[in-house]
Amino acid sequence: MNKQKGITDMGVKFDRLVYGGDYNPDQWLEYPDILEEDIRLMKKAHVNTVSLGIFAWAKLEPQEGVYDFDWMEEIINRLYENGISVFLATPSGARPHWLADRYPEVLRVNEMRQRNIFGQRHNHCYTSPIYRQKVRQINMKLAERFDHHPGVLMWHISNEYGGECHCPLCQSAFRSWLKKRYNNDIKEVNRKWNTAFWSHDYQNFDQIESPTPLGETSIHGLVLDWKRFVSHQSVDFCKAEIQALRDAGGTKPATTNLMYNFPTINYHEMAKVLDVVSWDNYPQWHKGPERLIAMDNGMQHDIMRTLKKEPFILMESCRDRQTGSLSAN
């Protein structure tokens, strides 16, 4: 069996404990003195690495096709001059307003078949060709500009992949996925899903819809295959993001920050498209028996270690879930 590429194969040499966290200077660009004070405090705290640009799409591309990377380069330069490296993010984790306004198909549709309006964070369709195109474009631009920079240590792909979309594009993709899985044989679908129960047999693939309280949720095979499909779309989206970097000449290793046992992603499949596994650990202390919370977090570390059977990166953490929620809001 071929060994998956991992952190030891990609030339990532950590000659020190990589220590830091997310840094979002795009939120206060009008106050340049903050950067200098932040750098002073980072050095005092022995921070040597930050994740940069995770939610910066609106600043990187304020208008469609109009890119502004100068501020990012200045920040990377100043950090590097002070011994601070960067995990540079692709910004697909939160889209700009102009993208949703002009291309509403990028917004998710919930299980009740209602399309979301602009807002929140994970509110984008992984199937949407427009969203994939726009993400590919900005990823390639970022790779062309920054992959060669000595201060950029790795690529941080998006942020905490998760969630699902029930839009017409996803319904069509789901049916295509089912046709491939079941050799275009609707009778095989009925047999595997045991749809004869309650007389729920399908006559053709066009009748199949994703699980919804408005319709079907009782067929376990449908629910399970939908989860498999959503995981497939999420992993494929991440793979496409990384491919955009590679197509633009990017050679730096790529990771994405996983997050506990998200039910919509098979992390073993996600790990196959990553060079390095990383995850976000936010223990929810004081919400139950602390022994069990500690055991669960220990188990999560074990799971992350087994995904590639190599060292992993703890990308985010916090003293408690409440602090994390406050910092996010």
Question: Residue spans of the language-model regions?
Answer:
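Short, solvent-exposed turn/loop segments enriched in Gly/Ser/Thr/Pro and often Arg
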Residues: N24-P25, S51-A56, A89-W98, L153-G162, ...
